[in-house]
Amino acid sequence: MSNPIWQALEDRVRRRPADPVVTYIDADGQRTELSAKTLANNAAKAANALRDEAFVEAGSRLALHVPWHWQRSVWTLAAWLTGATVVPGGLPDQCDLVIAGPTEAPGVLSGQFGPTGQGEVWVVSVHPFGLPNPSLPEGCLDAATIARIQP
């Protein structure tokens, strides 16, 4: 892939795959680290999900309503891998897909962040291991479940 950030990550995977590249510490002090290999794997699966399930491609726009969490890194990198533009806090009606955290999704659906538009809303997990969301707002899809089945 020609993305310079992806190339840097691939280089890191070749040189030091187990070293952390993303460290997230939640409000309770729980620490989650993603190694270069884990970040690359998660981003590749998420990119495949975006491309194959939501038909995201170069020129697509993704509204990102994800809290400061390790998932934000994964889904931003995944969008860039597809050639899409990431719009942090983007207006849902001006984007092809909305990626939201579980606490942000209801606001997206209610119009808190602007007109809702016709695109899907995928909800990312904020579980330390990225497990599927136990409950989703009506009309949302679970990003963890969609990405997990990707090659």
Task: Kindly label every feature range from the protein language model.
Residues 8, 77, 81-151:
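Structural core segment of the AMP-binding/adenylate-forming
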Residues 7-11, 34, 57:
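Cytosolic catalytic domains that perform sulfur/thiol-centered chemistry
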Residues 21-23, 150-151:
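ATP phosphate-binding P-loop of adenylate-forming
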Residues 11, 49-53, 111:
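A generic secondary-structure signal
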Residues 2-22:
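A short N-terminal helical cap/helix-turn-helix that marks the beginning
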Residues 6-7, 44, 70-73:
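Residue-level marker for well-ordered alpha-helical positions
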Residues 49-85, 89-90:
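Conserved AMP-binding/adenylate-forming
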Residues 22-56, 77:
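Conserved AMP-binding/adenylate-forming core of the ANL superfamily
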